[in-house]
Regions:
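Non-catalytic nucleic-acid substrate-recognition regions in nucleic-acid-modifying enzymes
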Residues: 2-137
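Core structural elements
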Residues: 140-148
């Protein structure tokens, strides 16, 4: 059985309902929210949605959600996520981020700590001393809103 992920399709203001309806027509149980719609599906479903959604800007995979009020907790909770399920051993990890209404407000520190945790997890998962990062670029977007 293929793993199911929580997915999202972003949309311009006013198109959230259109995106949710497009997803429903594709067979997903979609729920609209401010800025898009969410649904559950496999990686193949995410690819299919990315190809066939007309009103969406992009399709996102929500990989982890947790409370983080310290940089240590941000590191440890990112490190336990199974990044090796999605990233190959030579992935170039590119982390962007945003912080709002949270105790952790330094975006550059959040990005740096998240990347370090991902790299540490990948090194352990693939039995490497260092991560070569000479493969395809994988964009990881870390958002912290109200400490989550």
């Amino acid at each position: 059985m293929k793993k199911t992920y929580h997915l999202g399709a972003t949309a311009a203001f006013g198109l959230e309902g259109v995106v949710a309806n497009e997803l429903k027509r594709m067979g997903f149980d979609a729920k609209g929210f401010h800025g898009g719609a969410t649904f559950d599906g496999t990686l193949e479903d995410a690819f299919r949605a990315n190809l066939w959604l007309r009103a969406a800007d992009r399709v996102l995979l929500y990989f982890g959600r947790f409370k983080a009020v310290t940089f240590d907790s941000l590191f440890e909770q990112n490190k336990v996520l199974p990044w090796e399920e999605l990233l190959p051993r030579n992935a170039e990890v590119y982390v962007t981020g945003a912080c709002a209404r949270s105790q952790l407000m330094s975006v550059s520190d959040v990005q740096s700590i998240a990347k370090k945790a991902i790299v540490e997890r990948m090194k352990k998962a693939y039995s490497l001393n260092w991560l070569p990062e000479d493969g395809a670029r994988y964009h990881i977007d870390v958002h912290i809103h109200q400490d989550e």
